[in-house]
Amino acid sequence: VLTTLWHHYEVDNIRVALRGVEAGATWDQVLHLLYPMPRYVEVTLERMEKMVRSGSVTGAVSVLRGTQYHSLLNHALTRYEEERSLFPLEVALDLGYRRNLWDVVHSLGKQDREMALKTIGMVLDIDNLLWALRFRVYHHLSEVEIINYTLPMGYEVADDDVRLIARGGD
């Protein structure tokens, strides 16, 4: 679980690299925004640099081939190309990371799983509720889009709670 939690920072670094590509930033500009990650990484600094130097978001995603992040981002590339917004790519990263974390928690032994579910489950519930609100209020997404951009599981927050927010209920 701890290694998977550490990947949260790797996901943030990938997001920073993609934003750097989109903004036309140099590698030196992006490098100073990255979390230092001396271990537990799948995407090395060298690979991050290749992403930024690729010159395009599509090229940056292709640099991630062979990692767990490539398929997540590749799946969202069509929507990125249609909208010219990093939003679908960033949501794909967030959802993929949290689904993986949920799976890792559920693979633990009974006692460890129960303890991890209480702490990590609560964080995932909060993320899900905040995402649903943010997607409705600030991004004006449809109910279906909000459901697609939130986690289908939770600890104490039920899917119906997220659906209620997506519909605009109190």
Spell out what each predicted region is.
Residues V1-D170:
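Extended alpha-helical surfaces
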